[in-house]
Amino acid sequence: MNYFPWLTIIVVLPISAGSLIFFLPHRGNKVIRWYTICICVLELLLTTYAFCYHFQLDDPLVQLTEDYKWINFFDFYWRLGIDGLSIGPILLTGFITTLATLAAWPVTRDSRLFHFLMLAMYSGQIGSFSSRDLLLFFLMWELELIPVYLLLSMWGGKKRLYSATKFILYTAGGSIFLLIGVLGIGLYGSTEPTLNFETLTNQSYPIALEIIFYIGFLIAFAVKSPIIPLHTWLPDTHGEAHYSTCMLLAGILLKMGAYGLVRINMELLPHAHSLFSPWLVVVGTMQIIYAASTSSGQRNLKKRIAYSSVSHMGFIIIGIGSITDPGLNGAILQIVSHGFIGAALFFLAGTSYDRIRLVYLDEMGGMAISMPKIFTMFSILSMASLALPGMSGFVAELIVFFGIITSQKYFLMAKILITFVMAIGMILTPIYSLSMSRQMFYGYKLINAQNFSFFDSGPRELFVSISILLPVIGIGIYPDFLLSLSSDKVEAILSNYFNR
């Protein structure tokens, strides 16, 4: 038991300090921006300090645990703790949220509410990744939806209300299944409700009931991940949202679904997962091909990047379905890797829109001449997205490949077929990625326009882009830094499958 409540402070600080924004004196938006950035930086420093000095890498058990009785009436606890699975997403959340607040510098309308919602979302996300109680996980999952809905409906494009409504209908529908699953597991087989992850890991269920629970959780996480065919909210949402919100959606929100699949479906329901894993692999493979080929036909720049996100999430699903050490490690690495790359691409797409006020690729062209810095950063990150060796995406996708090839669960012909289809998906990725760069940056369309006067990236935008690029290259060159965090926990999860 840890005596200093590090995780409680990390979870509660953003939303509690964020609520003080409304009491700041009226001295323009600059005060609010700096205050929000300071909270995010302080939070990131606290998280890094707590993990560096209080987290043992060689211990697969839950660390920094906190366990407080919250509501006596139905045995509800405030249980927090981290292990090798949650440490990567928590650090990713802190990093991306800090850069997203910096990216939101141009937002001037209702600035207080905007920054408060970003901080409230931050608390919900950290809470989801660090909760060790099933009901607390559900509460944090829901807490995070409200700020996202408001951010989508109040700031963005002309169809933002439509996309926000679509988002909330999909996610609230998924949350119903999540709540049913949480209550079903908590109330099963005992007079006292049991919601503690540690207790539930050792709980066994009749196979039919376990399959029902599994399907309920799978639907909830499939909406968030997103897994086809529950992905249609994502392109609309990304197409209309402000780019700082897109950074949070692509960088963190999608990763919550993948995290939930590993944390609940894999860890708590191993029998059902071993039955469903072949279907997950098939759906993941279809998703890579479908999203990559659909992305090529998108005229809207942000929708094209959104479909590329759906395609990359396919690798995570295949890694989770492979039930192997490399497959699951690769999926966790891809969660962090795509969090950085997706956020960076949306940021650069948004800064480009701020300058040229165009969203359709066939209206762009010639940006490379007037904006060489944006061109350079976008080109490098496009290469990272298509898994160029030396970038984080390459390592993650390669390890997932090894995972599916070395899996004992599938026949040789099935593995060859899956690998072949995945390889086709990886060939389709450069097609939409490089054609996107060509349509945006090459040619003369914008130069021939009457009001041709565009300025390149300023110091703030360059700082955000480089800050995201450095971890992408760092993970690509030395992936062991992240893999060493998760490998012990992955072995502990997979021991449920091989000891039966």
UniProtKB/Swiss-Prot annotation:
<keyword id="KW-1133">Transmembrane helix</keyword>
<feature type="transmembrane region" description="Helical">
    <location>
        <begin position="411"/>
        <end position="431"/>
    </location>
</feature>
<keyword id="KW-0934">Plastid</keyword>
<feature type="transmembrane region" description="Helical">
    <location>
        <begin position="207"/>
        <end position="227"/>
    </location>
</feature>
<dbReference type="GO" id="GO:0048039">
    <property type="term" value="F:ubiquinone binding"/>
</dbReference>
<keyword id="KW-0150">Chloroplast</keyword>
<feature type="transmembrane region" description="Helical">
    <location>
        <begin position="37"/>
        <end position="57"/>
    </location>
</feature>
<dbReference type="InterPro" id="IPR022997">
    <property type="entry name" value="NADH_Q_OxRdtase_chain4"/>
</dbReference>
<feature type="transmembrane region" description="Helical">
    <location>
        <begin position="134"/>
        <end position="154"/>
    </location>
</feature>
<keyword id="KW-0793">Thylakoid</keyword>
<keyword id="KW-0812">Transmembrane</keyword>
<feature type="transmembrane region" description="Helical">
    <location>
        <begin position="386"/>
        <end position="406"/>
    </location>
</feature>
<keyword id="KW-0520">NAD</keyword>
<keyword id="KW-0472">Membrane</keyword>
<feature type="transmembrane region" description="Helical">
    <location>
        <begin position="167"/>
        <end position="187"/>
    </location>
</feature>
<feature type="transmembrane region" description="Helical">
    <location>
        <begin position="242"/>
        <end position="262"/>
    </location>
</feature>
<dbReference type="GO" id="GO:0042773">
    <property type="term" value="P:ATP synthesis coupled electron transport"/>
</dbReference>
<dbReference type="Pfam" id="PF00361">
    <property type="entry name" value="Proton_antipo_M"/>
</dbReference>
<protein>
    <recommendedName>
        <fullName>NAD(P)H-quinone oxidoreductase chain 4, chloroplastic</fullName>
        <ecNumber>7.1.1.-</ecNumber>
    </recommendedName>
</protein>
<feature type="transmembrane region" description="Helical">
    <location>
        <begin position="462"/>
        <end position="482"/>
    </location>
</feature>
<dbReference type="InterPro" id="IPR010227">
    <property type="entry name" value="NADH_Q_OxRdtase_chainM/4"/>
</dbReference>
<feature type="transmembrane region" description="Helical">
    <location>
        <begin position="272"/>
        <end position="292"/>
    </location>
</feature>
<dbReference type="InterPro" id="IPR003918">
    <property type="entry name" value="NADH_UbQ_OxRdtase"/>
</dbReference>
<feature type="transmembrane region" description="Helical">
    <location>
        <begin position="305"/>
        <end position="325"/>
    </location>
</feature>
<dbReference type="GO" id="GO:0008137">
    <property type="term" value="F:NADH dehydrogenase (ubiquinone) activity"/>
</dbReference>
<feature type="transmembrane region" description="Helical">
    <location>
        <begin position="113"/>
        <end position="130"/>
    </location>
</feature>
<keyword id="KW-0521">NADP</keyword>
<keyword id="KW-1278">Translocase</keyword>
<feature type="transmembrane region" description="Helical">
    <location>
        <begin position="4"/>
        <end position="24"/>
    </location>
</feature>
<feature type="transmembrane region" description="Helical">
    <location>
        <begin position="330"/>
        <end position="350"/>
    </location>
</feature>
<feature type="transmembrane region" description="Helical">
    <location>
        <begin position="87"/>
        <end position="107"/>
    </location>
</feature>
<comment type="similarity">
    <text>Belongs to the complex I subunit 4 family.</text>
</comment>
<keyword id="KW-0618">Plastoquinone</keyword>
<dbReference type="GO" id="GO:0009535">
    <property type="term" value="C:chloroplast thylakoid membrane"/>
</dbReference>
<dbReference type="InterPro" id="IPR001750">
    <property type="entry name" value="ND/Mrp_TM"/>
</dbReference>
<dbReference type="GO" id="GO:0015990">
    <property type="term" value="P:electron transport coupled proton transport"/>
</dbReference>
<keyword id="KW-0874">Quinone</keyword>
